C-alpha cells in the first residue's frame, strides 16, 4: 500500500504513495491506511481498498495459507480468516470495482486481520505490536497490482500450481510505466502509462517523493544480456545509456573519465555474508569458528573478491539501523594468525578433517572469495575444498531453518562454509528485525545457513515483535550481539559496489541521476526507471 521509502543520512522515511496517509493505534497493533482516490491501473481498472484486500488474501492463499505469508513475517492471527476457493469464486462473480453485498460482508468483517472500512480505507490488525510494520508494505505483497486482472485471467492459482499466464503477461500496476512487450530471457519494453495518476504532479510534489516522478522518456527497453563484453560494448558505443558492468570489464570503467558508476552509500544494507555451520563438524565447535574468523585476511579478501570496495561489519544487523547496530561497540574480527592457531589448539582436534566451502559458480567473486579463504585457512592447518555449483543448484541447498537442519543428513550437500542466498544480500524487508530473523533465528525462512539458534539471541529477536520500548530492545540486543560475536557463526562484508564486483554504469553527461531500490537489491537491481534524468 505504501509505495516508497527513502534513506536520509542513515534514517528511513516512509513516504505516501497509493496511501495518502495512515494512522497507527497506540499499541502498534492496528494500521489504518487511507487510499488515494481517482487512481486506476494502467489498463483502466479502478484502484480501491477492495483491490488491496483481494491482493493480500490471494497472496495468503497461494502460500498455502501460511501464517507467515506476508514477507515471511508472522504478524497476523490468520485463524479468524476463512479465505479460499469459494471466496475467489465470489470475487469472480462480483468484481472488485463495486463488490456485491455477499462479498462486502466478508471484506468488512473486522474479525479478520485485514478488512476494509470503505472503498478507500483498509485496516491491518496485527496479532502483536510491531512498530516496523510499514517496512513490510513497500516490498513484494505491498507492491500493488490489479487483482481484477488476475481474476479475469484464471485467478492466482494455488500453492502447488501458481498461474503461469502472468509470466508472459505482466499484471498491470498503477505506476508511471507499463509493460508493452515481454520476451522472456531477451528483453522487456516499457511505455509511459497513459493513465498514471501522478502525471501532473508539481515539481514540489515530486521533490517531496521522487519515486512518484512520471518519468522523462516515453519508451524504455531493457535488454537481457548475460555477456559482460556485450554490455560494455553497448554502453561504450552509446547503444545503451545504462548497463551493468562486472569484474571482467571493470578495469575499463574505473580509469575512464567518461564513465560514472553507482557506489553504495555509507548507510546501506547491501552485504556479502559467509556462514559457519554451527551443527556440522568441525565448525560446530566454537573454538574452530573463532579460529576461522581470525585466520582470514579481510583486507586481502575485500581487495580480491570485492574489487577493494567493502568493509567488514558486525553481524547481523544492517548499519542503516544505527540505534540497533553493534550496540555493545564491538570491533570486527581481526586477522591474527597467532590467535587463530591458539583457538584451533584449544579445540583439541587430533586429526582436523577438511571442510567444504559451497557457493555459486555463476558469479566470479564467490570463487575468488573461496580461494582467499582456502589459502588463509591453510596457514593454520585447515584444508578447504571448494564446491562451486550453478546458482539454481546452490539455491536448493538453502531454505528455512528446519529445511537446513534436514540437509545436514545429506553429506553430499552439507558444508561448513556457505554464502546465504548464494549471492549478495539485500534485505527482504525494511525493518531492523530482518537481518536478525533471516540469519540467526530458528524462525528464519531463508538465510540461516549457519543453522544457528541461541536462547539469548531468540529472546532479543522476539522483543522486536512484542515491545515498542527502544531502550528495552537495545538492552536485549546488546546481550544477543555479544553472544553472537563470541559464537562466531557469521562473517559480514558491507559492499561498496551495487553488484559486488561491478555496478550500474552510465556515460557522464548522458545520464544525470536516478534512484535505486531502497532495499539495496532486495527487490530490484535496476535503476528506478521513472527517476532517471538525463544530462
Where are these regions (language model features)?
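N-terminal lobe/hinge region of extracytoplasmic solute-binding protein
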Residues: 1-26, 172
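Gly/Pro-rich hinge or "lid" segments in bacterial periplasmic/extracellular proteins
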Residues: 4-9, 125-130, 136-219, 229, ...
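Aromatic- and charge-enriched surface segment that lines or borders ligand/interaction sites
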Residues: 20-86, 123, 231-234, 282-284
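Short helices/loops that flank or line small-molecule/ion binding pockets
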Residues: 44-45, 229-240, 287, 371-380, ...
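Alpha-helical secondary-structure segments
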Residues: 48-57, 119-129, 175-176, 214-219, ...
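Extracellular/periplasmic solute-recognition and catalytic clefts
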Residues: 66, 180-191, 221-280, 410-411
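Surface-exposed binding/hinge segments that line
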Residues: 69-154, 183
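Detector for C-terminal structural segments
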Residues: 183, 187, 270-271, 293-325, ...
Amino acid at each position: 500500500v505504501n509505495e516508497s521509502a527513502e534513506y536520509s543520512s542513515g534514517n528511513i522515511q516512509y513516504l505516501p504513495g497509493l496511501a495518502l496517509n495512515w494512522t497507527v493505534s497506540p499499541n502498534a497493533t492496528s494500521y489504518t491506511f487511507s487510499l488515494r482516490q481517482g487512481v486506476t491501473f494502467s489498463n483502466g481498472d479502478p484502484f480501491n481498498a477492495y483491490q488491496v484486500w483481494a491482493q493480500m488474501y490471494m497472496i495468503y492463499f497461494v502460500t498455502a495459507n501460511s501464517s507467515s505469508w506476508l514477507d515471511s513475517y508472522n504478524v497476523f492471527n490468520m485463524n479468524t480468516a476463512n479465505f479460499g476457493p469459494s471466496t475467489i469464486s465470489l470475487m469472480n462473480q462480483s468484481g472488485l470495482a463495486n463488490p456485491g453485498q455477499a462479498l462486502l460482508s466478508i471484506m468488512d468483517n473486522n474479525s479478520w486481520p485485514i478488512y476494509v472500512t470503505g472503498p478507500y480505507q483498509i485496516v491491518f490488525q496485527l496479532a502483536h505490536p510491531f512498530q516496523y510494520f510499514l517496512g513490510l508494505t513497500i516490498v513484494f505483497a505491498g507492491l500493488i497490482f490489479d487483482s481484477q486482472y488476475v481474476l479475469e485471467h484464471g485467478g492466482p492459482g494455488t500453492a502447488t500450481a501458481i498461474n503461469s499466464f502472468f509470466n508472459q503477461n505482466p499484471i498491470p500496476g498503477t505506476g508511471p510505466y507499463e509493460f508493452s512487450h515481454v520476451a522472456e530471457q531477451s528483453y522487456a519494453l516499457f511505455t509511459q502509462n497513459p493513465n498514471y495518476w501522478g502525471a501532473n504532479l508539481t515539481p514540489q510534489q515530486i521533490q517531496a517523493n521522487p519515486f512518484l516522478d512520471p518519468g522523462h522518456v516515453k519508451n524504455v527497453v531493457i535488454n537481457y544480456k548475460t555477456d559482460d563484453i556485450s554490455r560494455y560494448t553497448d554502453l561504450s558505443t552509446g547503444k545503451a545509456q545504462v548497463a551493468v558492468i562486472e569484474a571482467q570489464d571493470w578495469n575499463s570503467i574505473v580509469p575512464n573519465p567518461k564513465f560514472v558508476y553507482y557506489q553504495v552509500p555509507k548507510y546501506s544494507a547491501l552485504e556479502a555474508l559467509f556462514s559457519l555451520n554451527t551443527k556440522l563438524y568441525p565448525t560446530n565447535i566454537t573454538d574452530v569458528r573463532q579460529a576461522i574468523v581470525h585466520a582470514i585476511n579481510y583486507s586481502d579478501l575485500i581487495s580480491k573478491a570485492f574489487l577493494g570496495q567493502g568493509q567488514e561489519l558486525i553481524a547481523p544487523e544492517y548499519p542503516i539501523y544505527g540505534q540497533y547496530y553493534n550496540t555493545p561497540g564491538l570491533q570486527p574480527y581481526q586477522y591474527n594468525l597467532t590467535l587463530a592457531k591458539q583457538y584451533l589448539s584449544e579445540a583439541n582436534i587430533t586429526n582436523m578433517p577438511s571442510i567444504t566451502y559451497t557457493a555459486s559458480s555463476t558469479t566470479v567473486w564467490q570463487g575468488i572469495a573461496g580461494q582467499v579463504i582456502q589459502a588463509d585457512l591453510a596457514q593454520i592447518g585447515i584444508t578447504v575444498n571448494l564446491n562451486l555449483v550453478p546458482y539454481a543448484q546452490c539455491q536448493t541447498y538453502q531454505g528455512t531453518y528446519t529445511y537446513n537442519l534436514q540437509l545436514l543428513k545429506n553429506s553430499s550437500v552439507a558444508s561448513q562454509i556457505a554464502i546465504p542466498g548464494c549471492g549478495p544480500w539485500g534485505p527482504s524487508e525494511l525493518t531492523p528485525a530482518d537481518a536478525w530473523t533471516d540469519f540467526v533465528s530458528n524462525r528464519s525462512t531463508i538465510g540461516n545457513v549457519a543453522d544457528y539458534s541461541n536462547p539469548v539471541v531468540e529472546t532479543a529477536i522476539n522483543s522486536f515483535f512484542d515491545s515498542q520500548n527502544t531502550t528495552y530492545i537495545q538492552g536485549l540486543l546488546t546481550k544477543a550481539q555479544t553472544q553472537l560475536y563470541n559464537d562466531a557463526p557469521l562473517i559480514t562484508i558491507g559492499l561498496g559496489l551495487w553488484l559486488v564486483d561491478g555496478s550500474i554504469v552510465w556515460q557522464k553527461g548522458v545520464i544525470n541521476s536516478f534512484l535505486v531500490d531502497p532495499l539495496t537489491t532486495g527487490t530490484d537491481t535496476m535503476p528506478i526507471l521513472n527517476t532517471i534524468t538525463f544530462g
